């Protein structure tokens, strides 16, 4: 990981550093970020949380995206459901998430927190069900925070507090958009 960081030449990146889910194989097809072509161009996606896999989740995924699934994770299936909803929403990410949150409501999930990197923006999604959080996790485990300092905007979840005196909480049920060219930041309600 550190070797890759020292060689990377990019203005934007997303990283998902965590322990692997116990029952799933540790292999490239199960590794974040997931990257696909979409109506928005190339899109990269990482997810922190758990979504019950099964018929309810599969019903939200178009057949072509279902056929492209490579791994076994709920995260990849959630991403395919997002891509399906993006298609239905003509690439409007806010509208796609507003619909997706409604579609996910009857599905058992802890969190559909995500970071999404497109050709034009970085998007951070905060949507979780505190009542479904495992008791061994800290109460703020799925809470998300962000800050902008000297033109650099960063976002993080549990355990990371780069500057405890200068950060904003991203409200549960909201989405943060960062324009990659201008650095402009906007928030939107999604749930």
Regions found by a protein language model. Name each.
Residues 1-191:
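N-terminal segments that mediate ammonia production and transfer
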């Amino acid at each position: 990981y550190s070797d890759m960081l020292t060689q990377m030449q990019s203005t934007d990146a997303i990283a998902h550093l965590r322990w692997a889910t116990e029952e799933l194989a540790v292999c490239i097809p199960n590794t974040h970020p997931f990257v696909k072509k979409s109506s928005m161009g190339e899109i990269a996606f990482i997810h922190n949380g758990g979504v019950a896999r099964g018929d309810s989740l599969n019903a939200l995924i178009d057949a072509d995206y279902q056929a492209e699934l490579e791994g076994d994770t709920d995260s990849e299936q959630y991403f395919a459901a997002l891509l399906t909803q993006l298609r239905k929403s003509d690439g409007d990410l806010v509208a796609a998430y507003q619909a997706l949150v409604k579609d996910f409501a009857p599905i058992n999930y802890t969190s559909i927190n995500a970071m999404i990197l497109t050709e034009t923006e970085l998007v951070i999604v905060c949507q979780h069900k505190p009542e479904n959080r495992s008791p061994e996790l800290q109460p703020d485990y799925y809470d998300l925070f962000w800050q902008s300092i000297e033109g650099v905007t960063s976002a993080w979840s549990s355990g990371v507090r780069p500057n405890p005196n200068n950060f904003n909480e991203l409200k549960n049920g909201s989405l943060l958009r960062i324009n990659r060219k201008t650095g402009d930041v906007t928030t939107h309600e999604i749930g």
